[in-house]
Amino acid sequence: MTTIVSVRRNGHVVIAGDGQATLGNTVMKGNVKKVRRLYNDKVIAGFAGGTADAFTLFELFERKLEMHQGHLIKAAVELAKDWRTDRMLRKLEALLAVADETASLIITGNGDVVQPENDLIAIGSGGPYAQAAARALLENTELSAREIAEKALDIAGDICIYTNHFHTIEELSYKA
């Protein structure tokens, strides 16, 4: 699968992901970019799950952002509604982590839109390892959001066989 981690600290929000794509238990590609900028670079998003499914969801989410003038929560709720109720979309298997200057969210195909505590998100097969690492670093260091995300991905990559050490990182700055 993959690992996507999002950390928010001191006026910065980061979403970072590894680059491994697998087919069954075979690595097919090691440099997939699973994190990207959307809506005029005001939103960052990462995916865990099927690559083709995720690209479809990125496109749909960007349309929802445009429809709601960049309002992240409204766009996320509308995407989750469509994802849950549309027969074709329901078959898509992926999770999205999205963030802007005000919120960090997880969007699922079950219709869930979750804003996690401490604005810390970790999804995918390496998510539990990345979340534990990031939480420890948030609580015990003064590292930046970017440094925490990188270290959390490194730790997940050392433990999870579906996560590698090729990282794509996107960062937004805002007034804290």
Swiss-Prot record:
Functional summary from the UniProt entry: Protease subunit of a proteasome-like degradation complex believed to be a general protein degrading machinery.
Residues binding Na(+), per UniProt: G157, C160, T163
Catalytic activity: ATP-dependent cleavage of peptide bonds with broad specificity
UniProt KW keywords: Allosteric enzyme, Cytoplasm, Hydrolase, Metal-binding, Protease, Sodium, Stress response, Threonine protease
HAMAP family linked to this entry: HslV
Inhibition and activation profile: Allosterically activated by HslU binding.
BP GO annotations: proteolysis involved in protein catabolic process
Enzyme class: hydrolase
Similarity comment text for this entry: Belongs to the peptidase T1B family. HslV subfamily.
Protein's name according to its UniProt entry: ATP-dependent protease subunit HslV
EC nos: 3.4.25.2
Encoding gene (name): hslV
SUPFAM superfamilies for this protein: N-terminal nucleophile aminohydrolases (Ntn hydrolases)
GO CC, alphabetical: HslUV protease complex; proteasome core complex
Catalytic center residues: T2
One of the record's GO molecular function terms: threonine-type endopeptidase activity
InterPro entries the UniProt entry points to: ATP-dep_Prtase_HsIV_su, Ntn_hydrolases_N, Proteasome_sua/b, Proteasome_suB-type
